[in-house]
C-alpha cells in the first residue's frame, strides 16, 4: 500500500470514529443515559461503580457520569489509538481510565466533577 493510501485509510477511520462518537454523545446517551448496558458495575473497582461507559465501534469507549436528579451528563474521556480496548493489556481503555481515576482526575464525586468541568 502506498503512503498516500495509508494516510487516506487512517483519515477515513478517524472520520468514522469521530462520527460514531458524535452520534453517541448527542443522540444515543442523551436518549437514555442510565441504560443498564452503559453501567460499568465493578469493572474498574467497586469505588468507581457510579461511572458509565458506552461502546463506540469495537475498540473505543466513552466514559461519563450522569446525575438523574439534575439530568446532567458529563463526558469525561474517550480512549484513542494508544489505548484501544484489548482485554488484559496495560494500555486497555478500562485500565487506562482506572489509572486516571486512581490518580484523582477526573474527580470521584459528581459535584467535584461538575465543578471541574465548568472551570474548563
Where are the regions that the model predicts?
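Basic, Lys/Arg-enriched alpha-helical interface segments
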Residues: 1-60, 66-120
